[in-house]
Amino acid sequence: MAEYYQFAHSVQGYNHIKANKVCQDASGECHFEDVCIIAVADGHGSDNYIRTDRGSKFAVSAALTAIKAFVQEARENHLSTVPDSETELIQVSKNILARWYTQVENDVACEPFQPEELAKVSEKYKQRYASGQYNAKAYGTTLIAVCMTNEGWFGIHIGDGKCVELLENGTLCEPIPWDEACEQNITTSICDSDAIEEFRYVIQKDFPAAIFIGSDGIDDSYSSCLLYTSDAADDLI
């Protein structure tokens, strides 16, 4: 296994700067022993998702923690850290969701929704948030997470954004299946009631030259997927 360098960085997009909106993306990385984990989450731009910037941070935290726990438990039980099927990754995704929902409910309990937060929210969502039964919607976000170990790597993805793999021979590909439900400004989300059914996965036992993950704020800045992946390769080589 080659030695990998992992990094994560998020910046406020130009449109958010113009609209005086906070950065709604979050990213993070974790490294221990020979394991590299990176995650990125993209909050939703609609005014109805009033705490989406917090939701994306919670998603990154939940993903890094859940994946690290999975790898550590696998090693303690002398099991492969890169599963042979998606069954184990579905359990990881359930763990991520549970951790994310716990953070959301704790946040609402500590800091209930304020009138000024709800000023631009539609009447439909105001009623939902007032009922206390739809708190998670306020924190909606996408999520991509990738874990590299000495046995290969795996990825978990819900919503839009891209995962680009650069192979040793210079070939570029998107190894995680695309979700056709994600189109233009519509995306699946970790806050969906059926979110566990919307996760997609990749499991590989080989070692690419590099892996790049990013929110749709990056790939939407390019006129074509080819330009995006080419730029990603240039940046990573």
What is each model feature region?
Residues 35-46, 157-159, 205-226:
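Conserved beta-strand-loop-short alpha-helix elements that form
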Residues 228-237:
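Single conserved hydrophobic/aromatic residue that forms the stacking wall/gate
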Residues 6-21, 114-136, 140, 165-206:
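PP2C/PPM family metal-dependent serine/threonine protein phosphatase catalytic domain
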Residues 1-68, 161, 192-202:
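N-terminal entry segment of metal-dependent catalytic domains or homologous docking segments
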Residues 78-164, 198-205:
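Catalytic core of PPM/PP2C metal-dependent serine/threonine phosphatase domains
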